Design a protein with these regions (language model features):
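Substrate-binding pocket helix/loop in short-chain dehydrogenase/reductase
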Residues: 94-95, 99-107, 207
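Active-site loop immediately N-terminal to the catalytic Tyr-X3-Lys motif
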Residues: 96, 148-154, 176, 214, ...
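Alpha-helical segment proximal to the catalytic Tyr-Lys
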Residues: 123, 172-176, 235
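C-terminal helical subdomain
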Residues: 183, 202-233, 237, 246
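Short C-terminal tail/terminal secondary-structure segment
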Residues: 238-260
Length: 260
């Protein structure tokens, strides 16, 4: 018997990487999963996971799409039990150079999108509780960059800081209904974005020099935490961000010092 038997989940950004790993693990634990992604590759991803998965093309920053994907998920079994807010993008530019449009684009996906789908999903979950059904669970994807800034990742760092606070606000608002909301803060995970860095030995060395465990994590390791948070094993945990970073945030490391 799986930890998520009979549950219906939405995983945004589920076409690849961490989102796909979470979708795969949820299905292995007995859940039905709706992969919500703007990437049409989500269709093939869902097909690869079998009959327990379906794909709904979703722009998380569009309110209409947020309502649609929740309705589609409820069409699977009548209820929505789990939402994983995983969709996210980056834009690399220095603070002095980044354009307003690029800043807005990242915030729209990473933070506003999480709010939009989170609110629609939460309203559905509250209605289910009022109907005498079990409370749902929401898992938001944060990052160590909610706590540790990178100079050329301005909107990403800002958005993830916002995710941590949004998670707390959601948790407090929904606790009276028994609905739990937590976040996961990954460190260096072997996604498509990081694979390019991992093949550059100098870049990989810099990455590992600030990772005490000395390796890059696999997306399945994030999926394990997402499964725990969605399950009854985490029944008294809400409003928390669990950092999965190989010890990165515990490390107090030095920076280069200019000569006198």
């Amino acid at each position: 018997m799986g930890k998520l038997d009979g549950k219906t989940a939405i995983v945004t950004g589920g076409a690849r990487g961490i989102g796909l790993a979470i979708a795969r693990r949820y299905i292995a634990e007995g859940a039905r999963v709706v992969i919500a992604d703007i990437d049409e590759g989500g269709k093939a991803a869902a097909a690869s996971l079998g009959v327990a998965a379906r794909f709904v093309r979703t722009d998380v920053g569009a309110a209409g799409d947020a309502r649609n994907v929740v309705a589609e998920a409820c069409g699977v079994s009548g209820d929505l039990d789990i939402l994983v807010n995983n969709a996210g993008i980056i834009h690399t530019a220095d603070f002095l150079d980044i354009a307003e449009a690029d800043f807005d684009r990242v915030i729209r996906v990473n933070l506003k999108g999480m709010f939009l789908i989170g609110q629609v999903a939460a309203k559905q979950m509250v209605a289910q509780v009022k109907a005498g059904k079990p409370p749902g669970v929401i898992v938001n994807m944060s990052s160590i960059n909610a706590r540790v800034a990178i100079p050329n990742q301005v909107p990403y760092c800002v958005s993830k800081g916002g995710v941590d606070q949004l998670t707390k606000v959601m948790a407090l608002s929904l606790a009276p209904h028994g609905i739990r909301v937590n976040a996961i803060g990954p460190g260096s995970i072997m996604t498509d974005i990081l694979k390019g860095v991992a093949t550059d030995q100098a870049a990989k060395h810099r990455l590992l020099s600030r990772t005490p465990m000395g390796r890059i994590a696999d997306p399945d390791e994030i999926a394990s935490v997402a499964t725990f948070l969605a399950s009854n094993d985490a029944s008294y945990i809400t409003g928390e961000t669990i950092y999965v970073d190989g010890g990165r945030l515990a490390l107090n490391y030095t920076v280069p010092v200019a000569g006198n």
